[in-house]
Design a protein with these regions (language model features):
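Flexible "arm" and connector segments at domain edges
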Residues: 2-69, 73-104
Length: 104
């Protein structure tokens, strides 16, 4: 996304409902073959990796990091839908991992 447009969006009052968010995910899945969506997800995860690396080295910026985190988050939602993973299954798996993290 164009950086200026992203910043303008952050400063706007846009707030999608859960239904609108789910519809956007469905539209993305219906527009492109599932393998292409998976490839896009991998690319977005790589961009997040690069942005985190920049943060570690002191060259990153907060807006860039947020944008890549959100892209990766959206891609996770796409993958959940593509691979038919229910919100309940995701939450249970998150709880298992968080419990392990909590005990460290």
């Amino acid at each position: 996304m164009n950086r200026t447009r992203f910043i303008q969006g952050l400063n706007s009052n846009i707030e999608l409902s859960d239904k609108e968010r789910r519809r956007a995910i469905r539209n993305s899945i219906n527009k492109r073959p599932w393998k292409l969506n998976c490839t896009i997800a991998m690319e977005e995860f790589a961009e997040l990796t690069q942005q985190v690396s920049k943060q570690i080295r002191g060259y990153g910026d907060r807006i860039g990091l947020i944008e890549e985190m959100v892209d990766a988050y959206i891609c996770l939602k796409l993958l959940e839908s593509i691979f038919n993973i229910s919100p309940e299954d995701m939450q249970k798996a998150i709880d298992v991992k968080m419990d392990r993290e909590r005990k460290r």
